[in-house]
């Protein structure tokens, strides 16, 4: 966070460190404080903080592990905190401005999930194919998962620049449904995604397919190498950017992926809206090679699996 004059002159850098400010929630000009969300405690978590304009008195206001969202009172006297983590379904807490609990507004009875053999997701680490970077993935196992047995895998992907999938938050009910059908459900944050700073995020600039395809392949191969994934039964699915991800896996990574469901995909970003695409890819006239490499159409000759494409008549 930086403090500037209205004419753009830098007054002071307020925050620093190897973590990301995710969102500025409010600026209290009278008391010279900034309230913001950040992943300082963990790359997998959004927590609520305050700090003075002078860069001092950085204070964590949400002490519960997990992913938080807050609604700050207009008079800065307190806030409503909504959070969950991998082991705790959504809770809604009323707190004072120091982060002290005033009242539990509502919370979910976890025992209701356990009646359905809820499978608690696990965050894992694996290495990139060049061993340069440790990446994060998240797995939902089938109920009664047994080590030594290989399972079919569904990779749920998105992978667009600056986004993040792997979080410490309550799991998806759709992933639970798939796990209950006997699948391992796997997602990962490839190089070029969010949570690890600008250098990591900018790795995908100019070619959105390069690390997305390589790092997803590395993640799947890791599951195969530790003996839990059936290499003959690997599928992918996703929506929008995830639809693109699925198309890419079934073509560029056709030797790994057998089947996919692609919903509302962008198969060639030259055909998508420029306001989104050009901030990650530059202009088509200046980056033909990057647009060609990013396009799913460049790899259709490799396609050999089964792909279901679902689309409407319009998108953004």
Language-model segments: residues:
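Residue position within the beta-strands of beta-propeller blades
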Residues: 33-37, 79-82
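Structural motif
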Residues: 1-2, 43-49, 87-94
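Multi-bladed beta-propeller domains
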Residues: 4-30, 38-41, 51-68, 97-127
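Serine-hydrolase catalytic core recognition
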Residues: 67-316
